UniProtKB/Swiss-Prot annotation:
Phosphoserine: residues carrying this PTM: 4
GO cellular component, as recorded: cytoplasm
Name of the molecule in the record: tRNA N(3)-cytidine methyltransferase METTL2A
Complex formation: Monomer. Interacts with DALRD3.
Residues where N-acetylalanine is found: 2
UniProt superkingdom: Eukaryota
Modification Phosphothreonine, positions: 154
Reaction(s) catalysed by this chain's protein: cytidine(32) in tRNA(Thr) + S-adenosyl-L-methionine = N(3)-methylcytidine(32) in tRNA(Thr) + S-adenosyl-L-homocysteine + H(+); cytidine(32) in tRNA(Arg)(CCU) + S-adenosyl-L-methionine = N(3)-methylcytidine(32) in tRNA(Arg)(CCU) + S-adenosyl-L-homocysteine + H(+)
Length: 378
C-alpha cells in the first residue's frame, strides 16, 4: 500500500502539506475520542485483508447484458438519483478551499505562480489571447444545504437544460463568459455543492464558472437555485464520454478544471479520451484538480459478490457505477494527456462512529496536474 506521502510528489508541496489536517492517532486506545483521524497508515495485515476482500467481491461479475444496460441508461440512473435526493444528499464542499487553494479568492494565481517559481519555471500569465482573456457515494453527506434551497416557482428551464452545446457557435471572441479574466469549469457538478461555494466566496467580477453534469435533473436543480446567476455561471448538460459533443468554450480558455468524485463514475476504457479532451480546454499553465475514490476504500470493500463490472469497477444498488483508483493510474491518465504533476497523494482517513463504536477506513486520492507553458515545439 502506498503511504500518505507518495513517491514522486514535489518535496516542496510535501513539506507544506497541511490540507488533510493534523489529527494523528498515536494512541489506538484513543480512537473513539474524535470522529476522524488523518493520514492513518495501514498495517500489512490490514492491507492484505482489504486485498482479499476485493478478490472475493470481484469473483462474480455482472452479466454482459446488464453491463450494457448500465452504460446505455446511465443518464436514467443518475436522473433517478437526483429526482429522489434532489439537493439534500451532499453538503456544500467548503473544504475545497483548504484542499485546493487555487479556488480561493486572490490565491488562484498566486498559488500557481509559487509552484512554477519553486520548480524554476516561467510564471504563466493565465490569460487568453486578448488582454485578459458519490455510504453510496462520496462521504455519505446526507444533509440538507441552505445554499441549495431552490425556488419552488420558476420558469420552465427545459430548453436551457437540454440545449445542445454542439449547436453553439464557439469562437475565441464570443462565448459564455468570454469577457471573464479567470474561468473555472466543474465537470460532474451535481446540484452545485462546489459551484455555489466558489461563487459565494469569490466576488471577483472577472470570475466566470462553468458547470456541467450528465444528469439533466441535476442541472435543472442548479439553474433553479436562488444562488444561480447567469452573469457569473453557465450550467449545461454534458456527457463526459461523448466525443461528438463540444464544450461551450474554445480550446485553451480555462484556468481551472475541477473533477470531484466524477471520473470514477465512467467506464475505465473511456477515461483517457475524456481527460484528453478536457486537457485541450486548459490554458498553458492551467490546472486540473481531482479528488476521487482510492483503491481499497471502505466503499469498495463493502460491495457484495455480483456487483463487480470489471477490475475495481462496481455498480451500486441504484444503478450508478464507481471505480477505485491507484495513484499510478491517475498519473498515467493525466501525463498521457500532456499534463505535468503538481500533486498526487493519498488521503487515508479513519472515520469513527462513536455511538456504535465503529471504525471506517476511507481512501481518497487528490491530484493537481498542470498544462505546460507553450514551448518552441508546441
Amino acid at each position: 500500500m502506498a503511504g500518505s506521502y507518495p513517491e514522486g510528489a514535489p518535496a516542496v508541496l510535501a513539506d507544506k502539506r497541511q490540507q488533510f489536517g493534523s489529527r494523528f492517532l498515536r494512541d489506538p486506545a484513543r480512537v473513539f475520542h474524535h470522529n476522524a483521524w488523518d493520514n492513518v497508515e495501514w498495517s500489512e495485515e490490514q492491507a492484505a485483508a482489504a486485498e482479499r476482500k476485493v478478490q472475493e467481491n470481484s469473483i462474480q461479475r455482472v452479466c454482459q447484458e446488464k453491463q450494457v444496460d448500465y452504460e446505455i441508461n446511465a443518464h436514467k440512473y443518475w436522473n433517478d438519483f437526483y429526482k429522489i435526493h434532489e439537493n439534500g444528499f451532499f453538503k456544500d464542499r467548503h473544504w475545497l478551499f483548504t484542499e485546493f487553494p487555487e479556488l480561493a479568492p486572490s490565491q488562484n494565481q498566486n498559488h500557481l505562480k509559487d509552484w512554477f517559481l519553486e520548480n524554476k519555471s516561467e510564471v504563466p500569465e493565465c490569460r487568453n489571447n486578448e488582454d485578459g482573456p458519490g455510504l453510496i457515494m462520496e462521504e455519505q453527506h446526507k444533509c440538507s444545504s441552505k445554499s441549495l434551497e431552490h425556488k419552488t416557482q420558476t420558469l420552465p428551464v427545459e430548453e436551457n437544460v437540454t440545449q445542445k452545446i454542439s449547436d453553439l457557435e464557439i469562437c475565441a471572441d464570443e462565448f459564455p463568459g468570454s469577457s471573464a479574466t479567470y474561468r473555472i469549469l466543474e465537470v460532474g457538478c451535481g446540484v452545485g455543492n462546489t459551484v455555489f461555494p466558489i461563487l459565494q466566496t469569490n466576488n471577483d467580477p472577472g470570475l466566470f464558472v462553468y458547470c456541467c453534469d450528465f444528469s439533466s435533473t441535476a442541472i435543472e436543480l442548479v439553474q433553479t437555485n436562488s444562488e444561480y446567476d447567469p452573469s457569473r455561471c453557465f450550467a449545461f448538460v454534458h456527457d463526459l464520454c461523448d466525443e461528438e459533443k463540444s464544450y461551450p468554450v474554445p480550446k485553451g480558455s480555462l484556468d481551472i478544471i475541477i473533477l470531484i468524485f466524477v471520473l470514477s463514475a465512467i467506464v475505465p476504457d473511456k477515461m483517457q479520451k475524456a481527460i484528453n479532451r478536457l486537457s485541450r480546454l486548459l490554458k498553458p499553465g492551467g490546472m486540473m484538480l481531482l479528488r476521487d475514490y482510492g483503491r481499497y476504500d471502505m466503499a469498495q470493500l463493502r460491495f457484495k459478490k455480483g456487483q463487480c463490472l470489471s477490475g475495481n469497477f462496481y455498480v451500486r444498488g441504484d444503478g450508478t457505477r464507481v471505480y477505485f483508483f491507484t495513484q499510478e493510474e491517475l498519473d498515467t491518465l493525466f501525463t498521457t494527456a500532456g499534463l505535468e504533476k503538481v500533486q498526487n497523494l493519498v488521503d487515508r482517513r479513519l472515520q469513527v462512529n462513536r455511538g456504535k463504536q465503529l471504525t471506517m477506513y476511507r481512501v481518497w486520492i487528490q491530484c493537481k496536474y498542470c498544462k505546460p507553458l507553450l514551448s518552441s515545439t508546441s
